């Protein structure tokens, strides 16, 4: 399984948007041929986010295919195989901005065998735009994507009932599909959902309001995206340490001789000079002496920024540790229940040995039990003795080393992890910690398990 990379996103623009709180991460999903890539292309085109040379390239490829107009889906179909097959098979990322907001957009695949890519695209999203073909209504893959959005606790879900022009802009068809969507969303516990009729091909209700849907009086898709609130700064401070920075050999200058900093990308919250922090899993405490961003010193840094934090005490901190707000740190656990979206073609069985990766920390783990699987037909949890590709199940894991974790419903950054093949290094599954109401989640023994 390939690891998607974030392309076409100016690093300075992303950092600036993250710092101001104007950045919105969105993902598109839906069944194959629902028009996801066309909708994204229309959104980019109508919001004037397409460069002239990009549009010229799309027009030329469209002409080569024998089309009479530009195929806007090509604006996001970045892989050669996508262009040849006409389907999105990986997550295509795009950065764009309007006067009101900056966006990182992930266009996810629709085929059921690529659900794992959809999990990747939705895992960091503030909003998921789910497309439903007005001719087909709610399908199993629609339910699957809604289940993934609910599982990943995506704060906002927008459902675009697309290709509404192909059912003659029928108010009755739209009303029936909207009712089905809201019923499924309620069963899955989707927190907030918006539904609107669209035609990505013609542009109805994407950027400009449609005159063909008088039965819909709500905002356009872009209007929704520009107005949705984000809660990116409300979580407690977390910084998974990616690198310990300390001069090797002779320091280039006296002031750097005793320099020691802990570099990483802030996963949640805000940190300020003077804040008390705790090092996890050891539990040692200190205060923030300084925050460095390149050659600049900052008084504070926020979620999404990559910084180096210096502490007032020479405590033991290593790659894989987490710096957390001292007054609001997660539990350090060695046993945990989690919802797991299984992404491997090889089934998951009890007693399987895997690696669990959380932030920058990777530990050995064993599957203690598989306690159920989500049935996408009736949205109930049924008994299961294994998880197959694209299954979503409840799994109990025993960890070889303590890991700081929290319930995913409380904190997406503290509650998310990956399961990795210990031999080949491939991603096997995405997990969401489920502690609330289970009575499970075994804390590690007091900090003696940390390094001495």
Per-region residue spans from a language model:
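Residue-level signature of catalytic and energy-coupling elements of molecular machines
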Residues: 33, 39, 58, 86, ...
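P-loop NTPase switch module centered on the Walker A-proximal segment
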Residues: 4-113, 125
């Amino acid at each position: 399984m390939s690891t998607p990379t974030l392309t076409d996103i100016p690093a300075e623009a992303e950092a600036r948007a993250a710092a101001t709180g104007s950045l919105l991460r969105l993902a598109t999903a839906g069944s194959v041929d629902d028009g996801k890539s066309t909708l994204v292309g229309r959104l980019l085109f109508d919001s004037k986010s397409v460069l002239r040379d990009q549009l010229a390239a799309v027009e030329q490829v469209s002409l080569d295919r024998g089309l009479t107009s530009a195929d806007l889906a090509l604006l996001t179909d970045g892989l050669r195989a996508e262009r040849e097959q006409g389907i999105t098979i990986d997550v295509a990322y795009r950065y764009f901005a309007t006067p009101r907001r900056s966006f990182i957009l992930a266009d996810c695949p629709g085929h059921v065998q690529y659900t794992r890519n959809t999990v990747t695209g939705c895992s960091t999203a503030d909003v998921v735009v789910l497309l439903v073909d007005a001719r087909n209504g709610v399908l199993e893959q629609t339910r699957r994507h809604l289940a993934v959005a609910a599982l990943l606790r995506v704060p906002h879900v927008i459902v675009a009932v697309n290709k509404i022009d192909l059912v003659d802009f029928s108010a009755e068809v739209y009303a029936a599909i909207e009712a089905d969507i809201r019923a499924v969303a309620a069963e899955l516990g989707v927190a907030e959902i918006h539904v609107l009729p669209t035609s990505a091909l013609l542009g109805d209700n994407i950027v400009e309001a449609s005159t063909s849907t008088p039965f819909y009086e709500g905002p356009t898709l872009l209007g929704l995206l520009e107005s949705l609130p984000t809660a990116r700064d409300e979580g407690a401070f977390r910084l998974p340490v990616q690198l310990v920075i300390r001069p090797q050999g002779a320091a280039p200058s006296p002031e750097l001789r005793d320099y020691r900093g802990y570099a990483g990308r802030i996963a949640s919250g805000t940190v300020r000079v003077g804040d008390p922090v705790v090092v996890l899993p050891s539990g040692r405490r200190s205060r923030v002496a300084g925050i460095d961003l390149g050659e600049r010193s900052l008084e504070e840094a926020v979620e999404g920024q990559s910084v180096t934090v210096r502490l007032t005490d020479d405590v033991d901190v290593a790659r894989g540790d987490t710096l957390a707000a001292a007054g609001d740190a997660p539990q350090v656990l060695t046993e945990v229940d989690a919802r797991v979206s299984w992404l491997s073609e090889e089934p998951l069985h009890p007693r399987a040995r895997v690696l669990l990766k959380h932030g920058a920390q990777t530990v050995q783990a064993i599957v203690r039990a598989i306690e159920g699987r989500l049935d996408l037909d009736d949205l109930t949890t049924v008994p299961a003795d294994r998880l197959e590709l694209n299954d979503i199940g409840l799994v109990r894991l025993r960890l070889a080393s303590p890991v700081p974790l929290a319930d995913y419903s409380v904190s997406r950054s503290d509650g998310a992890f990956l399961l990795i093949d210990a031999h080949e290094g491939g991603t096997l599954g995405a997990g969401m910690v489920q502690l609330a109401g289970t009575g499970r989640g075994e804390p590690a023994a007091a900090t003696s398990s940390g390094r001495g």
